[in-house]
């Protein structure tokens, strides 16, 4: 059976800030922020970046992360644009808060570039999440020193902003014990976000799988029976669900795509991604990338299960 490229369970672009040298920053990307942070801080011998090994900068605090990228390539594009805000094509020249290669060293510049990139039409429709592990950093972002959120055009904000429960605030780095305490607490916050995100996706996937495996479901649009069919073509085995797992909406992915595109506000030639689609049953706002993620993931899991049955 034909296969689609898997959307990663997690992929994010993060901002590190040195706990001991608060004016030192690092931007990177990873599918596993916990492992990556340990690498940067030297807890794991392999990995890490040369710049984060410089004397006096370790340990690092992960203060923010943008996650939910549909592919590694998309995350790397965001990372490169964030690192090169003075020349990236994803920020219009007149909107750049960083003008030169050596500019943009402050945290205000780093955070402003996040907003600029999230407002770009390429990243907007990925329905990304900007998460803060440090409340003080979130406040700096909200303060918006360069007025990026007001001065740069955008139809709407398709991204979510969140803050860790018990997020760090003012950093006390007077002693080694203080620094290590911040390091430990930050690692716990990163671990919690990563594990919770994966656990929620696993739970949701199981609920969707149960809907398909039990009872008789028909497509909301074409009224054909929804059922995994190993001998069928790929379009018959990709399904769309509502993000509200209590909603009974289910359809073929292709049918949902046609419906959402027919209701999009922009001309068809301007976009190939449904904009802010709403469930036709309960009107919950859907994240199209999540709809695709669960559709492909469910198909792959069902195909794998069928293959195992054949070998028994």
From Swiss-Prot:
- GO biological process assignments: DNA-templated DNA replication; double-strand break repair via homologous recombination
Single annotated GO MF:
zinc ion binding
* Cysteine-cysteine disulfides: none
- Give the SLX1-type zinc finger regions: 219-282
Instruction: Give the location in the cell.
Output: Nucleus
Pfam families named in the record: GIY-YIG, SLX1_C
User: What are the entry keywords?
Assistant: DNA damage, DNA recombination, DNA repair, Endonuclease, Hydrolase, Metal-binding, Nuclease, Nucleus, Zinc, Zinc-finger
- Enzyme Commission number(s) from the entry: 3.1.-.-
Q: Which cofactor does it need?
A: a divalent metal cation
User: What PROSITE patterns does the record point to?
Assistant: GIY_YIG
An annotated GO cellular component? Slx1-Slx4 complex
Q: Which CDD domains match?
A: GIY-YIG_SLX1 (cd10455)
GIY-YIG domain location is 9-92
Give the quaternary structure: Forms a heterodimer with SLX4.
Quote the function comment for this protein. Catalytic subunit of the SLX1-SLX4 structure-specific endonuclease that resolves DNA secondary structures generated during DNA repair and recombination. Has endonuclease activity towards branched DNA substrates, introducing single-strand cuts in duplex DNA close to junctions with ss-DNA.
Which family does the similarity line name? Belongs to the SLX1 family.
Q: What is this protein called?
A: Structure-specific endonuclease subunit SLX1
* Organism the protein comes from: Candida glabrata (strain ATCC 2001 / BCRC 20586 / JCM 3761 / NBRC 0622 / NRRL Y-65 / CBS 138) (Yeast)
């Amino acid at each position: 059976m034909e296969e689609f490229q898997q959307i990663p369970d997690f992929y994010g672009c993060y901002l590190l800030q040195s706990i001991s040298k608060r004016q030192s920053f690092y931007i990177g990307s990873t599918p596993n922020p916990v492992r990556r942070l340990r690498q940067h801080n030297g807890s794991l011998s392999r990995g890490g970046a040369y710049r984060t090994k410089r004397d006096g900068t370790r340990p690092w605090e992960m203060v923010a992360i943008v996650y939910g990228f549909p592919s590694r390539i998309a995350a790397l594009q965001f990372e490169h644009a964030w690192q090169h805000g003075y020349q990236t094509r994803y920020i219009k020249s007149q909107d750049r808060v960083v003008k030169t290669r050596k500019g943009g060293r402050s945290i205000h510049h780093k955070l402003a570039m996040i907003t600029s990139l999230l407002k770009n039409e390429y990243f907007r429709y990925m329905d990304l999440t900007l998460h803060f592990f440090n409340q003080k950093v979130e406040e700096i972002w909200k303060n918006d020193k360069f007025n990026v959120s007001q001065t740069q055009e955008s139809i709407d904000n398709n991204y979510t902003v969140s803050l860790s429960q018990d997020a760090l605030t003012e950093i006390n780095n007077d002693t080694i014990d203080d620094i290590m305490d911040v390091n430990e607490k930050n690692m716990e916050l990163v671990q919690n976000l990563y594990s919770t995100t994966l656990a929620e996706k696993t739970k949701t996937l199981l609920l969707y799988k149960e809907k398909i495996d039990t009872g008789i479901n028909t497509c909301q649009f074409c009224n054909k029976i929804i059922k995994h069919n190993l001998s069928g073509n790929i379009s018959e085995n990709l399904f769309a669900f509502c993000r509200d797992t209590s909603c009974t909406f289910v359809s073929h992915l292709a049918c949902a795509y046609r419906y959402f595109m027919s209701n999009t506000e922009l001309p068809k030639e301007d976009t190939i991604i449904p904009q802010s689609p709403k469930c036709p049953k309960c009107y919950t706002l859907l994240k199209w990338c999540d709809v695709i993620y669960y559709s492909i993931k469910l198909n792959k899991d069902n195909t794998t299960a069928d293959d195992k049955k054949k070998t028994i």
